[in-house]
Amino acid sequence: MNDLFAASPPTLEGIHIGIGGWVYVPWRAGMFYPRGLLQRRELEYASRHVSAIEINSTYYAAQKPATYATWRSQVPAGFVFSAKAPRRITQSRRLAGTGTQIEDFVGGIAELGQTLGPLVWQFEQGYRLEHEELTGFLALLPRQARGRRLRHVLEIRDAAAVDAAMLALVRRHEVATVFTDSPTYPSFADLSTDLVYARLMRSQPRLQAGYPAPALRRWAAHIQAWRRGEDPAALPHLAAPSPVADTPREVYVFFIGAAKQRNPAAAMALLQAIAAG
């Protein structure tokens, strides 16, 4: 059984590819997790086959610092977590007044230490994201946690809130926005900082790897372009693509939802496609 934990994904500097969460019943019994694998060791296994995981449970409730410390201890060097911020913050009627709640959340999740990546602030469809409130909220986001740079990403699911003014605002605050490849949510790949965060939501149940091989190769090419500082014009944008950056961008890509049972295979196949490119 210990041989199950000897694997490691390809090392890709500045590129992190993964899945949403690690607790999912259909992944057991051979779909992703080997038969007989103890549930308490699923994170340990998953983190040796993908290079990042987006924590979804924190959207519903923040965890205890001890829980974050346990997760940190189970993953290998170089592995990164991103995490959704609690919805009690992002659904607040007074978004610009959530400073204490933000501090509490960040103070706890900072226990992830070197494994802590971006924090994702998800605003659901129907939430009225007023410009003034968003301005105040962005000013509250801490830029460091325990001496380490802390990155923030907005996922805006209401199309009415996605416009040029929003894009200009996040650029001023150097906060990223999620590029969501989905038929359901707003899909825009405009870049606002040196961080790229993509959620791919089109996996197909009939395909072993979730995506056709040509589609994975196209995503590998986009990811490599992002990493080089480019802004792929083939992806949907609100405005003209950004000029090529002077420095590389940090890239996070997660397979989320859709045919979720196939997402680990999709992530592993994409890692191999990037490494081969």
Set out the residue ranges of the language-model regions.
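Residues lining hydrophobic/aromatic ligand-binding pockets adjacent to catalytic sites
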Residues: 1-277
